[in-house]
């Protein structure tokens, strides 16, 4: 058996495993993009966009290509976000779902490009936009190119909102680093899952820096709701119903979908 046969065999095996995993929650309680999309979208309404967008290795970081390929095999995704359109309660919506299984959902060139393209697509077609964030932050291996995605996605979202678009940011566990400091914090409505860690730097880093113990639950969704940083906490079983209500209110008050 040559190396190509081994590679294809591994790819097929991972594909079977991923299809089985996609029907359930992960061991840590997180949802795969396909499972989350299935929970929120009307039956067979999802259409993926920009699946062909891939990252490179702009800094020639040793071993990066191999790590990316391993994560592609493991997840069945090209990168750490799935983008497309679906109907939620009958309302056509642009949706992005981040995948923390893929290099901890880190944002690099491909993630920034896909989110930016989807935002521009939603603006052109006057669709509401929902992004489910799940990320460890900017992708270290892509360096400055990764950090540039913070400004790029932020600019796209602000342009979308200035044009009258509705942006719902849905924060899941964890939403941290450069993602929390960019588009994830810009929602017209910001929703979080119960118990989600939402921060820039983690609590351990902050405690080591300031030399003080942080309050109980600091940087979790309940703490942020209590202090006015997010608008609501919604359990997964209520995801579709809540989003459907918000989207229908938007349509009924003059928004387009």
From Swiss-Prot:
Pathway field: Lipid metabolism; malonyl-CoA biosynthesis; malonyl-CoA from acetyl-CoA: step 1/1
Q: Which EC main class describes this enzyme?
A: transferase
User: What residue intervals traverse the membrane?
Assistant: none
**Entries under InterPro entries matching the protein:** AcCoA_carboxyl_beta, Acetyl_CoA_COase_Trfase_b_su, ClpP/crotonase-like_dom_sf, COA_CT_N
Q: Does the keyword Magnesium apply?
A: no
Q: Which family does the record claim for this protein?
A: Belongs to the AccD/PCCB family.
Q: What is this protein called?
A: Acetyl-coenzyme A carboxylase carboxyl transferase subunit beta 1
Please name the source species: Lachnospira eligens (strain ATCC 27750 / DSM 3376 / VPI C15-48 / C15-B4)
């Amino acid at each position: 058996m040559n190396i190509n046969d081994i590679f294809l065999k591994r790819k097929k095996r991972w594909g079977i495993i991923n299809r089985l995993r996609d029907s359930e929650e992960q061991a840590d309680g997180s949802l795969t993009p396909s499972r989350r999309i299935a929970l929120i979208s009307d039956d067979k309404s999802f259409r993926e966009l920009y699946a062909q967008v891939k990252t490179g290795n702009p800094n020639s970081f040793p071993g990066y290509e191999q790590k990316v390929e391993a994560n592609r095999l493991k997840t069945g995704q090209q990168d750490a976000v799935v983008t497309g359109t679906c109907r939620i309660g009958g309302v056509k919506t642009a949706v992005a779902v981040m995948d923390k299984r893929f290099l901890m959902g880190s944002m690099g060139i491909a993630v920034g490009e896909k989110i930016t393209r989807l935002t521009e697509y939603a603006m052109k077609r006057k669709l509401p936009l929902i992004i489910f964030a799940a990320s460890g932050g900017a992708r270290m291996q892509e360096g400055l190119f990764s950090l540039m995605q913070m400004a790029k996605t932020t600019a796209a979202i602000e342009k979308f909102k200035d044009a009258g678009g509705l942006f719902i940011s849905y924060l899941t566990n964890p939403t941290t680093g450069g993602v929390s400091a960019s588009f994830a914090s810009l929602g017209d409505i910001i929703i979080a899952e119960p118990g989600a860690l939402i921060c820039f730097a983690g609590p351990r880093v902050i405690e080591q820096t300031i030399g003080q113990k942080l309050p109980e639950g600091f940087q979790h969704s309940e703490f942020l709701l209590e202090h006015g940083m997010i608008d609501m906490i919604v359990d997964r079983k209520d995801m579709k119903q809540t989003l459907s209500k918000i989207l229908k209110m938007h349509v009924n008050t003059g928004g387009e979908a």
